[in-house]
Amino acid sequence: MTAPVRIALDAMGGDHGPETVLAGAEISLWRHPDTSFVLYGDEARVTEVLKSHPKLAAVSRIVHTDVVVGMDDKPSQALRRGRYKSSMWRAIDAVKLKEADVAVSAGNTGALMAMANFNLRTMPGISRPAIAAIWPTLRGESVVLDVGASIGATAKSLVEMAIMGSAMARVLFDLEAPTVGLLNVGVEEIKGVEEVKEAARILREENLDVNYRGFVEGNDIGAGTVDVVVTEGFSGNIALKTAEGTAKQLGSYLRAAMGRTWRARIGYLLARDAFRVLREKMDPRRANGGVFLGLNGIVIKSHGGTDAEGFAAAVDLAYDMVRNELLARIEKSLVGRQPPDVAACRPQAAGVEGQS
């Protein structure tokens, strides 16, 4: 019998704390009954909320801590004040100590990345971690990274992300040779900053077993032009938030238009099934959850403001990463595929101050 997937939850993370975290965990548990949980947070509060989730309570244990990383805390402050005591740190530490297979938090992104990087460390050959998101596209789904782990990138780190993103796409989408593109301001080879152009040269010329297809632009992400889109964290995070905002905006436009006249209401009723499919496709909660790639352990970041359904999607992703042995597959992908050292200015370190 297969052992259950052990998930460590930062029960206090996010805008809504245990209420959303535990409700989302139970939704995911219905889909993946071979899961157990360790809940890190205020024992009294977690126990009280858990009374409403008996199925989750039956497969969970609580580890008390009353130290919580705030959404506005700087990563350096979070590390100094409660590094070894906070619910966020304890969840990550459980992965390091092999007490859990994966950690999930909806807390402060910068603090989570700083703690994960400090505690788990990067894999051999990886200069820094990246956050990878699953992106709905016209052709299905793609992997986009980095979406906010750090600002700026060297050519070497972009190539590392291409290798890790390819491994993730193989795991998630069951692809033999996922296509990879570098996000740029144009598809012509002469365009872009030097780091991006140098990364493109390495991916073209070095034998890294990456199915590189060239530069892609912002509109190619949603079009699904490639299976993996690689970019640095600043532009990646802006692209992610823009896409989420656009989806919500279009949803609001549709709701307003459908209720404007009686003809529109009748039309909505006649096409209700089609609108339901559209609504599900545009729901950003379906793609909630970013994977911290490049660390010696799996950490999943949920949006802080998500609801129970959104958090459940992040827990689902955590489950899939463990069941599909993402860590082992990335390590295997890195063997013999290290990009050469390239001269590039060192950008701002991972765990950017003020991220949330």
UniProtKB/Swiss-Prot annotation:
Q: Which reaction does it catalyse?
A: a fatty acyl-[ACP] + phosphate = an acyl phosphate + holo-[ACP]
Protein keywords = Cytoplasm, Lipid biosynthesis, Lipid metabolism, Phospholipid biosynthesis, Phospholipid metabolism, Transferase
> Where is it mostly found?
cytoplasm
Pathway it acts in?
A: Lipid metabolism; phospholipid metabolism
* Any single GO CC term annotated in Swiss-Prot or TrEMBL for this entry: cytoplasm
Q: What is its EC number?
A: 2.3.1.274
Annotated GO MF terms = phosphate:acyl-[acyl carrier protein] acyltransferase activity
InterPro entries reported for this sequence: FA_synthesis (IPR003664), Phospholipid_synth_PlsX-like (IPR012281)
- Where in or outside the cell? Cytoplasm
Q: Any keyword Metal-binding?
A: no
Q: Name one Pfam family in it.
A: FA_synthesis
Any GO BP: phospholipid biosynthetic process
Any idea what job this protein has?
Catalyzes the reversible formation of acyl-phosphate (acyl-PO(4)) from acyl-[acyl-carrier-protein] (acyl-ACP). This enzyme utilizes acyl-ACP as fatty acyl donor, but not acyl-CoA.
NCBIfam families given in the database record: plsX
User: What family is this?
Assistant: Belongs to the PlsX family.
- Quaternary arrangement and interactors, per the entry? Homodimer. Probably interacts with PlsY.
The protein depicted here goes by the name: Phosphate acyltransferase
Q: Which organism is it from?
A: Xanthobacter autotrophicus (strain ATCC BAA-1158 / Py2)
